[in-house]
């Protein structure tokens, strides 16, 4: 049986955790558990350009493979169809992967896929993320996970770990916990930017997913924000969008020191999302 690691000092300090969420996400179809947070919640902050972020979690998810690459249970959200009217338009968003699970035995994971709305065919796996005791969390590692097609910033993201690194209310009872100890891969990535140039005009839809692997204990989730095509938000869109404008993506510098990484990513992700 897995043993939970609690840090009671951290949990006691954070006993009042912001949890302003709504049921599911407007303009998206949910299987499992999703919501919207309108204030900083534990380790997941609200980027300064936004008033809220979307999230999905394996806590409250459905049993079985939810359309990813295997798993015991999980959740997905799928956007309404959106139009791409210019070849090469940039699909952009940012995400923050949070997991209380760890070790390579229980590689909980997250992903985002882009589909062609005309025939439901997979166009691209934009990113994957997995629990990983050492090395990269994004892109994800493990059997069955495909190569990613989006450009992510930073190009390899590991988790911030340690006491308090999994405090996030969408994880339910797993918030603030970690499987075995904090050397096994639990934690959060902070905000990671993703950009993918859609090669052909047409109608598309986007799916985000999270899944438990190996068991249904120690939940995992993901926040995401800023989904846009050519700088035009795709959320709440179920008709053709206007001709996209050129999106300005600001360069994001990688931190030289691990202690500076979070503040640099936080500052620069706002530039990444700014249209």
Where on the chain are the PLM-derived regions?
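Sec/Tat signal peptide C-region and signal peptidase I cleavage site
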Residues: 17-23
């Amino acid at each position: 049986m897995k043993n939970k690691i609690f840090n009671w000092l951290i949990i006691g300090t954070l006993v009042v955790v912001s949890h302003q969420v709504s049921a599911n996400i407007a303009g998206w179809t949910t299987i499992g558990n999703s919501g919207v947070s309108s204030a900083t919640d534990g380790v997941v902050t609200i980027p300064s350009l936004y008033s809220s972020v979307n999230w999905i979690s394996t806590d409250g998810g459905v049993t079985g493979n939810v359309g990813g690459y295997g798993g015991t249970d999980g959740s997905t959200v799928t956007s309404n169809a959106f139009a791409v009217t210019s070849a090469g338009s940039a699909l952009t968003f940012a995400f923050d992967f949070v997991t209380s699970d760890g070790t390579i035995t229980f590689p909980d994971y997250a992903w985002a896929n882009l589909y062609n709305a005309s025939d439901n065919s997979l166009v691209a796996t934009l990113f994957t993320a997995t629990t990983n005791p050492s090395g990269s969390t994004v892109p994800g590692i493990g059997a069955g996970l495909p190569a990613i097609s989006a450009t992510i910033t930073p190009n390899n993201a590991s988790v911030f770990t340690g006491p308090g690194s999994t405090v996030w209310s969408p994880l339910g009872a797993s918030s603030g916990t970690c499987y075995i100890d904090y050397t096994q891969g639990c934690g959060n990535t902070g905000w990671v930017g993703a950009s993918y140039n859609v090669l052909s005009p047409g109608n598309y839809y986007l799916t985000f997913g999270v899944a438990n692997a190996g068991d249904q204990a120690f939940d995992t989730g993901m926040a995401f924000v800023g989904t846009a095509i050519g700088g035009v938000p795709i959320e709440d869109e179920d008709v053709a969008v206007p001709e996209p404008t050129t999106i300005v993506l600001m360069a994001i510098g990688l931190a030289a020191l691990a202690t500076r990484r979070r503040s640099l990513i936080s500052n620069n992700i706002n530039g990444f999302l700014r249209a």
